[in-house]
């Protein structure tokens, strides 16, 4: 059970992503506004 899973673009109830995020980057679970490479990815960037 990874708590850093990214939600779908429609379920992105996370606050704005970090500033060090690329363009099409969605916010992961409200886990300290973590950014993911793709809103469909399961790995989050710990930046």
UniProtKB/Swiss-Prot annotation:
Keywords: Chromosome, Developmental protein, Differentiation, DNA condensation, DNA-binding, Nucleosome core, Nucleus, Spermatogenesis. It is found in: Nucleus; Chromosome. The keyword Nucleus applies. GO terms for cellular component: nucleosome; nucleus. Testis. Pfam families: Protamine_P1 (PF00260). GO terms for molecular function: DNA binding. PROSITE patterns: PROTAMINE_P1. The keyword Nucleus applies. It comes from the Eukaryota. GO terms for biological process: chromosome condensation; sperm DNA condensation. Protamines substitute for histones in the chromatin of sperm during the haploid phase of spermatogenesis. They compact sperm DNA into a highly condensed, stable and inactive complex. Belongs to the protamine P1 family. This is Sperm protamine P1. The gene is PRM1.
